[in-house]
Amino acid sequence: MTVRLHASLETVLGRLGAEFGEQLTYPGIYRGSRLNVAPVLVEREGVSTVVISEADSDACRVMVPGVGKSVYGRYFDWDKDMAAPVRTFAQAVRDIAGDGTILCEAALPLVRYQALAESGPVELFGMPEPRPLFVYAKKRGEIEAQWLATRDADAAAFAPFVATLRDGARLVDAMTASARGFGPLDALCTEKGFPALYITAPHEVEMFTGLPARAVEQQGMGVLFRPGEAEITIHAEKPILRGDFRHVGTCAGLAQALGNCSHDVIAIQKDHISVGEFASLAQTGIRFEDAAYVIRRWQDRRAGDDAVYFFFAANAVLKGIDAARAFFARNAEGEITERDLVAAYHQGVSRFARHYGFADRVGSYFDIVHSGARTLLPATAGDYPVRVSDRTIKFDMGLTVSDAFGCIRGVSDIARTICAEAEIEALHDRLRNILIDELIPAIRPGMSGAQVHEIGVDLLRPLEAEFRRLGLLPEGKGVDGYLRDCGHTIQRQTISSVYFLPGVGEKVENGMLGCTEYVWPIGDILIAVEDGYLVTPEGGIAFTVEGEG
């Protein structure tokens, strides 16, 4: 009996349908490690089963018929037993495959493969052929200069709007206050004992080349970063015919390229590099560590350098949601779908972008729009109807903002809810006011994720009776049961190093950016509010509140 696991999105979506792919949320959110969160397809005795995270599982409604479903992970809602054990990816696969050998596609990310191999025997198919590489060097100072030149120009263009925000004068200053560049990454590598990093995800390689991810992907680039060195080494499958990339040689493949670099230890992106690609590196004798934390922490620490892009993205979302609300109100008696609301939202975003010189530089990496009656999971907007009778319609919107060279410099993660009932709307607005007036100002450098979560839950206590009166707390549960995050830091993708959750010891630092949020899912009600903040020594400053600067 042969059990096959297909990992490439091309194969999985080819089998399960394009509409299924369009409804997936998390492969878009995890821009640097899509396949580490994407569904996989397991075939056993002629039966196909998709293995998918619960957060993305609403997409299974539209996959082709005749395919089974195995779900792992857990997404918070009040009706679940959050103390129950959480099923892992490997368990979900083994529940289908059994204890025997799994024939696994070599495209699976290394970290997923390692978890699967710990659960039982695994063999690989579809191994990649070695690819010759062109080797280049680029001065990191040139990349940092590109960052500053584009940042300063965009900050000047957007300053008139930022000045209108509450605390606008401080926020305007913050847009050009720091230029940390690669410095924090040097320090993190030294702290962790990493003499070199090898970066493979196009989303991350952008920041080491000054080229947009699409160009990185087309050229087949990876980069070798050595802390403190003036040049970054770039490996490319195709020639790079640019004067700022100095050609220094060629090599037969990645194993030779890394083997030649004289390092005993190299940190790699284990959540991105495929097990097939990694298999070729065994002959090098190098010990490969995981670079995920160092990359995320660096991006968190340098996000303040690019504050203008985060300020723009967050406020563009709010303008878009305003446009969608107005469209919904005008057409409330007609037939409207979630995608109609998204179209109206993007029109509002585009108007805002054109006004401040960001036209053609704004993209979407998630559009979560749906009623609480449709699902409590973070589902991408689809062809589902929305009606005035829907008690809540959630918007949780992710935009990317690029600089003039096409490199993504900032993103949004902002949420609001259309509420049909006055009491629910009042509660939504109260939660939002708690975020911007109480929780965000309480965030200070040196606080852990657990400490911020504790404050966030404490601020909910005065509302507990109101939640209960409105039927928004199950019998026997109180606000202490709010085990969802109250927010997180943010960088060039939503995935970051600090989440405001119980048990998280990682700390926020001065100059970091992030989002605070409350998401309240129960029954057919889904209330979501989320606002952006900048960490300062005096406390956090919200950058999504209009008012006198």
Language-model segments: what does each one mean?
Residues 1-549:
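Active-site neighborhoods and metal-handling regions in enzymes and metal-associated proteins
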